Amino acid sequence: MAQNITPESLISILAAALAQKPTKPLVLALDGRCGSGKTTLADRLTRQFPASIVLHTDDFYLPPAQRVRGWEKTPCANMDLTRLRDEALRPAYEGQPVLYRAYSCRAGAYQPVQELAAQPLVILEGSYSHHPLLAGYETLQVFVTCSREEQTHRLQAREGERYANFSARWIPLEEGYFAQYRIEETADLAVDTTAANACAGMMCR
């Protein structure tokens, strides 16, 4: 099981690693339970380390027409992890600029090209970011979690009337992915955001 640390300890670890002036970017991957605060933690880290870029797995959903039959019951089947790896993660890991088009589920379309300059710290955040297809391009894997009760409270606040459907559809897929690939057990570190101040007064995302 990964060692549990605080967000402050993670900041210290990253600061020490970056102070060594590594020859390649440090790629931090934040995976974990929905509502645990992965995006909130990534936002905090980018404020702490301005020379960084953030890649969101949410930008790499597959368009519905490209998803296999029965994808709703298969972990990761709604994600285009190959495109994430080839267009964004691999170039960032190699210290190259990143050019990619996010897919918007809300709009049902690809968005204009985004260009991100190479930076010494790359933060990949979102569900499925520790998938074996991506792991070879990651320096440090951190699993972000919270208690079941706190997760329910946060998701109800975030999703509102959509919570019941969200909980029935996405949480089982996510937990299946964690179990299939032993994501929580194999992470380098873990951050538990259950404590009330873990998200610094912001809604955890």
Which stretches of residues belong to each language-model region?
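Hydrophobic positions on the alpha1 helix immediately C-terminal to the Walker A/P-loop
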Residues: 41
